[in-house]
């Protein structure tokens, strides 16, 4: 499996979308370690590379 490198814009969009999902009641995929804010949990999921969001890019 190839580790995908995201641009800063993709990371911002992914974290924002996942934080919204968590705030709306989606299950958390990492140990929260006392984090209560959805943004912190979304960032932890991205760092752990288990965030359930994919990026589709145009082929050039």
From Swiss-Prot:
Catalyzed reactions per annotation: RNA(n) + a ribonucleoside 5'-triphosphate = RNA(n+1) + diphosphate
Keyword tags: Cytoplasm, DNA-directed RNA polymerase, Nucleotidyltransferase, Transcription, Transferase
EC numbers, comma separated: 2.7.7.6
GO cellular component: cytoplasm; DNA-directed RNA polymerase complex
SUPFAM superfamilies linked: RPB6/omega subunit-like (SSF63562)
Domain of life per record: Archaea
UniProt GO molecular function: DNA binding; DNA-directed RNA polymerase activity
Purpose: DNA-dependent RNA polymerase (RNAP) catalyzes the transcription of DNA into RNA using the four ribonucleoside triphosphates as substrates.
Gene Ontology annotations of biological process type: DNA-templated transcription
The protein's assembly and partners: Part of the RNA polymerase complex.
HAMAP family xref list: RNApol_arch_Rpo6
Entry protein name: DNA-directed RNA polymerase subunit Rpo6
Keyword Glycoprotein assigned: no
Enzyme class: transferase
Transferase in keyword set: yes
Entry-linked PANTHER family: DNA-DIRECTED RNA POLYMERASE SUBUNIT K, DNA-DIRECTED RNA POLYMERASES I, II, AND III SUBUNIT RPABC2
Principal subcellular localization: cytoplasm
Stated family: Belongs to the archaeal Rpo6/eukaryotic RPB6 RNA polymerase subunit family.
Compartments reported by the entry: Cytoplasm
């Amino acid at each position: 499996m190839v580790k995908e490198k995201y641009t800063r814009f993709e990371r911002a969009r992914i974290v924002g979308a996942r934080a919204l999902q968590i705030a709306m009641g989606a299950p958390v995929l990492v140990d929260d370690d006392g984090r209560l804010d959805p943004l912190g949990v979304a960032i932890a999921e991205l760092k752990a590379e288990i965030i359930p969001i994919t990026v589709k890019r145009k082929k050039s």
